[in-house]
Every structure is written in structure tokens, then in C-alpha cells.
């Protein structure tokens, strides 16, 4: 299987997000990479589902709360940027202050 660098990045994000989701479901608090992967994967999937950039920017702020992450992580994640593939092309989605 031949994958482009972008496809490899998306696969890595998905794998990290899967680990994060399992840990979250077990009641563990997520660390920085897990939180970013969790939000990024949700944005990528939302774009694939046909949501708009504005919808995904809003949706990205609803995925995790301060209770879901380790102490200090919410302050570390100022924004999450994801280059997502939409039906009309690739666009950059930026979620500001995603963990509230």
C-alpha cells in the first residue's frame, strides 16, 4: 500500500485518537498529544461527513472539557489546526481554545 505523507499523518492522528478515546472511556485524563489527536480526528471525520469549516470550528470546542484532561493541559492547548479534506477541496480548520 502506497500512502502519501498526508495520508500517513492522518493515519497517525487516527491511531493516536483511538488510543485517546479508549483511555477517555476508561475514565483516564488525557495528556497533551492525546487531547490534540482526539480533537483533530473528530475534525477530520466531521469534514469527511460534509460539515462546514464554521460548524467544525464550533464542534471542536465541545469535544473535551477540563475534567477530561490532565491538570494544565487546557492552558497548553491554545488552538488546534487541522488540514481537512472537504467535498470541495482541502481547507485549514482552526479551533481556538478547544478545551473549556
UniProtKB/Swiss-Prot annotation:
Catalytic activity entry: urea + 2 H2O + H(+) = hydrogencarbonate + 2 NH4(+)
Entry GO MF terms: nickel cation binding; urease activity
CDD domains found in the cross-reference section: Urease_gamma (cd00390)
Subcellular location: Cytoplasm
Biological pathway: Nitrogen metabolism; urea degradation; CO(2) and NH(3) from urea (urease route): step 1/1
Alphabetical list of Pfam families matching this protein: Urease_gamma (PF00547)
Record GO biological process: urea catabolic process
EC number of this enzyme: 3.5.1.5
Domain of life (superkingdom): Bacteria
Membrane spanning residue stretches: none
Keywords of this entry: Cytoplasm, Hydrolase
Primary location: cytoplasm
Record's GO cellular component terms: cytoplasm
Subunit structure: Heterotrimer of UreA (gamma), UreB (beta) and UreC (alpha) subunits. Three heterotrimers associate to form the active enzyme.
Family: Belongs to the urease gamma subunit family.
PANTHER family documented for this protein: UREASE
The protein's name in its UniProt record: Urease subunit gamma
